[in-house]
Design a protein with these regions (language model features):
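Catalytic alpha/beta core domains of metabolic enzymes, predominantly
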Residues: 1-118
């Protein structure tokens, strides 16, 4: 970070990729990634980025694993999620997180996207 700032890159433009390893091969790495996100965000004060779908490589029902991991990562300080925006569960997880974390003030985005859906 110091080197980047010394070269004229503003701190707010620096994103750290904490790397996502597949849970099927490195299951203990899941919590390490989440802890790294938390540390980068809260101790270093930097923004974070993550390729979310890497977590589920080689597993069945990848969408389920991906959207739960995305929610866990957001809770631990993820700023920029590399996801497939065409998967409703992924965009839904982001919208629900923003609603519950009080980022989506007055639920505007959530209601705009889901207000016409029937209540189940």
């Amino acid at each position: 970070m110091d080197r980047a700032v010394a070269m004229g890159i503003p701190k707010e433009d620096i994103y750290i990729d904490c790397l996502t390893l597949t849970a099927s091969a490195e299951q203990e790495g899941v919590m390490e990634t989440l802890n790294a996100l938390h540390t980068v965000k809260n101790e270093l004060g930097l923004k974070t980025v993550l390729g979310v779908s890497n977590i589920s490589f080689g597993l069945p029902n990848r969408v389920l694993v991906n959207h739960i991991f995305l929610t866990m990562a957001l809770t631990n300080g993820l700023d920029l999620a590399i996801i497939n925006p065409n998967i409703p569960e992924m965009t839904g997880a982001v919208r629900a997180y923003k609603l519950l974390a009080n980022i989506d003030k007055n639920s505007v985005d959530y209601i705009k996207n889901y207000g016409a859906m029937p209540n189940v």
